[in-house]
Amino acid sequence: MQVIGITGGIGCGKSAVLNMLPDLCKCMVIEADKVAHEVMKKGQIAYEAIVKEFSTDILGKEKEIDRKILGNIVFSNEEKLAVLNSIVHPMVKTRIKESIEEKKKEGLLDFIFIEAALLLEDHYEEICNEIWYIYAPFDSRKQRLIKARGLSEEKILSIIKEQRSEEQFRRDCDKVVDNGGSIEDTRKEIVKLLENIEHQ
């Protein structure tokens, strides 16, 4: 079983790639964001550490962490965001490692795909056989983000500027998937990558 990391900047179409993968191979797709939601739930591994750090003011109904309140605190304060990430990210990675081990024992899958915005920063190369960079040119990304999220060009530029550059992604990833054309072109490219791995 191969573990493949999926990463790329905002608007590169990572979700579209993730959605097509289960039709192309026997796989499981793990999204780090969804795992983060899980570990932050009441009774889960990150809950107490987050409440201790940010106080019970962040709790909403049923004493669950209110992600909106927490978001308002951390996204205007880099220091607090770094603290939150230092709590959540290692726990997410641990939970993902556990899932991988579980699936390896079951032996039913050929691939596990892990998608995380900070895949490289959080050193997922330690648990991945390969990391794929989902690439799309700026104009494609811009159109997607205007359409899907209603963002202004100025806002899009400021988000992209904060993220890893295309050169850095290309340098640090093993494979590049060009997602700037049609969905069918992307699909063909992924099929080819999967076949290459299976024939190794």
Language-model regions, residue ranges each:
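ATP-dependent NMP and nucleoside kinases share a basic, alpha-helical "lid"
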Residues: 97-106, 111-148
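Walker A/P-loop
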Residues: 15
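Small-molecule kinase domains that catalyze NTP-dependent phosphoryl transfer to phosphate-bearing small molecules
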Residues: 96, 125-126, 147, 151-200
